[in-house]
Design a protein with these regions (language model features):
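Non-heme Fe(II) oxygenase metal-center motifs and adjacent flexible, charged/small-residue loops
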Residues: 1-213
Length: 213
């Protein structure tokens, strides 16, 4: 494991206890090196806009790596060992992703986390994810690890019911968000990437690592 994949500066690696079961690790990831691995994965399993069961196309472009990949189509939401576009296995999960996820989960108090699925989301312009629960996994005792790269975005946590009050936090490049325990089934979503005030660029990539099986 390369130490360069993680920030060791205590000023940039602040662990914030956002709420019960929710932890934010500021500047924990080296997005430059992680993005190099994302490009390799997406060369084998290109990003695509999946459809939800109702037929609407998602604004977020997605791909997967690891033994299992999350997919959505007219048949519903599910994990699959193969890419439905090609019938091939998803690309192997890079060691860098696995190492980052297990280290972040441990830092947040969730030991023995072993992700078998990594969803790659690309947010361009107005792309966003509305409030939802992650309920397609088999073991809800396992946390979720979310890695932000690129443009800033506002992440929201609701409660265990869709209409519960929401709390917001700003996610920035290199931030890692971990939630589990009492927060595992909380509704959550993320807004569109925020444009850089200097360049106008608004591109965000996110890794979501889970234990799905």
């Amino acid at each position: 494991m390369s130490a360069r994949l993680f920030s060791v500066d205590s000023d940039s690696q602040r662990i914030e206890h956002f709420d019960d079961g929710i932890f934010l690790l500021r500047g924990f990831a080296n997005s430059t090196e992680l993005m190099a691995q994302v490009r390799i994965v997406c060369a084998s399993a290109p990003l695509r806009h999946m459809t939800v069961p109702g037929g609407k196309q998602m604004s977020v472009a997605m791909s997967n790596c690891g033994p299992l990949g999350w997919t959505s189509d007219s048949s519903g939401y599910r994990y699959s060992a193969t890419d439905p576009r090609t019938g091939n296995s998803w690309p192997a999960m890079p060691d860098a992703f696995m190492s980052l996820a297990t280290r972040a989960a441990t830092a947040a108090g969730f030991r023995n986390f072993k992700p078998d699925a990594c969803l790659i989301n690309e947010y361009q312009s107005k792309a966003k994810l509305s409030l939802h629960q992650d309920r397609d996994e088999c073991d809800f005792t396992q946390p979720i690890v979310s890695v932000s790269m690129g443009a800033d975005a506002v992440f929201q946590f609701g409660g265990l019911r869709r209409n519960d009050a929401k709390k917001s936090l700003l996610l920035q490049d290199g931030d890692v968000l971990v939630w589990g325990g009492p927060a595992r089934l909380r509704y959550h979503g993320v807004g569109p990437p925020l444009a850089d005030c200097r360049t106008g660029a608004a591109l965000r990539v996110n890794l979501t690592l889970r234990n799905a099986a």
